[in-house]
Amino acid sequence: MDYCLQVAWIAGTKAITEQSNFMFSPLGLRAGLALLATGTDGETLRQLLAFLGSQHIHQLNAASAGLLAEMRAWPQLSFAAGIFVDRSLRLRPEFQSTAAAAHGAFPRSVDFQNQANAAAAEVNRFISQATNGRLNNTISPGTFGSSTKCVLANAMHFKATWGRKFESYDTQRRRFHRQDGTRVTVPFLSDPRTHYAARFDGLGFKVLQLFYKMVGHDGQVHFGAPCFCMLVFLPIKRDGLRHLLRMAVTEPDFVMRCVPRSEQEVSPCMVPKFKFSSELDARGALAKLGLGAPFDPLAADLSRMAVSVNTPPERLYVSAMRQKCAVEVDEEGTTAVEATYSCCSPTYSGPESPKPRPMSFVAEHPFMFAIVEYEKAQVLFLGHVMDPSNEE
């Protein structure tokens, strides 16, 4: 079971109840936790390794280094990680070298104690640059204070064009049915041709696979280039999103096992354009999933990360962990970004086979989506749309 995906159940069901759009990046969350684990020991390390599915920290770092190499080879994706360290803290050399080699994270010295807002502005500049200006002011003034000692941050920017673009003259305005029974008229992308699609009638949903163009770093189409796609999961019932999300996060490899295996005629084929951002309190969700030690001032052991130069020396715990994501889907393609950050502060002491037959696919009520690299089976983003007219 991918415990990072479990976060989507806790945060996603809350968003469904609030009738809010939602997206998070399991890849960004995993990267943030893996970097944190490098600086932990004892029960804190044990919990993080168990949560991330690794037997040993060396195994986790090797997997992180492999994933970092893969991401650097994906032209559609850029990834950056940073460690923002207060002047009262010295990073341990082993943590610093492993963070750079396995996680691509490099330290920057800041003054949280005396210039917390200036430090926040520097973290914001890092995130904005890494997301090509899509995420600005992620850290609000007042988020950091004199008790903030270290911030671990990562940011990811994904931008890809459709392998077969939607024509703007085919875009139609039609009604989208919200969960509360109200309706809103929004533009729908339309392409009534053959698509990779599947029906899972017994489980109550359909899946549409929309391919992104396979390009190399030179911007040209290359066979053998990374294979990205968006999977749109449409519940057959208008109120079926919660049940669908439950399957997605509890069934092993659910998202990847639902990838359609064959093309078929899909008419009509319509998906609304959407654009929104969402935020996640990862600390609260992770604690509910049993990962509590890093966030407990009495139990956290971040002793392999840094040494305090203060007298008496201070121990650290993770006082906050948050993620912000944004996505835009239109006729040209998709842009999706994420930023995940952790604040370290001192303590005080597979589904059934689908039935191949002609089908329609009109996403006119709440649906789930995933952006994946399907040859490596990596889920970059997972989210749902409750109201495509809401851009907040």
Swiss-Prot record:
GO terms for cellular component: extracellular space. Residues 333-357 are annotated as: RCL. Gene3D superfamilies: Alpha-1-antitrypsin, domain 1 (2.30.39.10), Antithrombin, subunit I, domain 2 (3.30.497.10). It holds the Pfam family Serpin. The record marks T347, Y348 as: Reactive bond. InterPro entries: Serpin_dom (IPR023796), Serpin_fam (IPR000215), Serpin_sf (IPR036186), Serpin_sf_1 (IPR042178), Serpin_sf_2 (IPR042185). CDD domains: serpinP_plants. GO terms for molecular function: serine-type endopeptidase inhibitor activity. Belongs to the serpin family. The reactive center loop (RCL) extends out from the body of the protein and directs binding to the target protease. The protease cleaves the serpin at the reactive site within the RCL, establishing a covalent linkage between the carboxyl group of the serpin reactive site and the serine hydroxyl of the protease. The resulting inactive serpin-protease complex is highly stable. This is Putative non-inhibitory serpin-10. It comes from Oryza sativa subsp. japonica (Rice). The lineage of its organism: Eukaryota, Viridiplantae, Streptophyta, Embryophyta, Tracheophyta.
